[in-house]
A protein has these predicted regions:
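Covalent nucleotidyltransferase
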Residues: 1-99
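Nucleic-acid 5′ end/cap handling module spanning
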Residues: 1-4, 58-65, 76, 90, ...
Length: 182
């Protein structure tokens, strides 16, 4: 995780990346555990990934659903610009992840030269069911919130009436989990 916590139920991803880390032991990947087929049930991914003592069934389900979407690397010297990091990622994927049916995917990265082009790509992302886009400047990686990486999202406000609630699950039991709204 980004806080250094080990996930116990992503062995299928670890196994796929093991040859890469054998050759590049100091490489740090930036990405997220995701599956676009579960875009409306992100809690499913979270519940699978956070299991501390996964059963064989949990491992099997995670292997069929949880993917690593890889979008950047953190280099040792932190002096490589984003466009060069992207090229390196594509080289690594070609060398180490040669078959497309594996749980490690490179996130599509496209250069844009104008707000209109960024808007067109963003609109295509929304039409594809994604929640937004990320705009990265061609700068070195910063391990913090940065102007060099901006979310591009559309927002809409709606009014709703709270008609109920659902109790939290697991360690959140006994607390408010979510509201039911109309």
């Amino acid at each position: 995780s980004r806080t250094g916590k080990q996930f116990m139920n992503v062995k299928h991803i670890e196994n796929e990346l093991q040859p890469l880390f054998s050759d590049y032991p100091n490489l740090i990947l930036d990405g997220e555990l995701y599956n676009h087929a579960l875009k409306n049930d992100f809690e499913k991914i979270i519940s699978l990934v956070r299991k501390q003592k996964p059963t064989n069934d949990d491992r099997s389900e995670a292997a069929s659903l949880v993917q690593f979407h890889w979008y950047d690397i953190i280099d040792d010297d932190n002096d490589i610009l984003f466009i060069d990091r992207c090229k390196f990622i594509h080289e690594l994927i070609a060398d180490y992840i040669p078959h497309p049916a594996v749980p490690v995917l490179s996130v599509v990265t496209l250069p844009v030269g104008s707000l209109d082009k960024a808007r067109a790509i963003h609109d295509a992302n929304l039409a594809g069911g994604f929640e937004g886009s990320i705009i990265r400047l061609n700068k070195v990686y910063e391990c913090k919130r940065s102007y060099n990486l901006q979310k591009f999202k559309d927002f809409s406000d709606k009014e709703a009436t709270i008609i109920g609630h659902v109790e939290g699950k697991g360690k959140r039991a006994g607390t408010l989990g979510k509201f039911i709204m109309r």
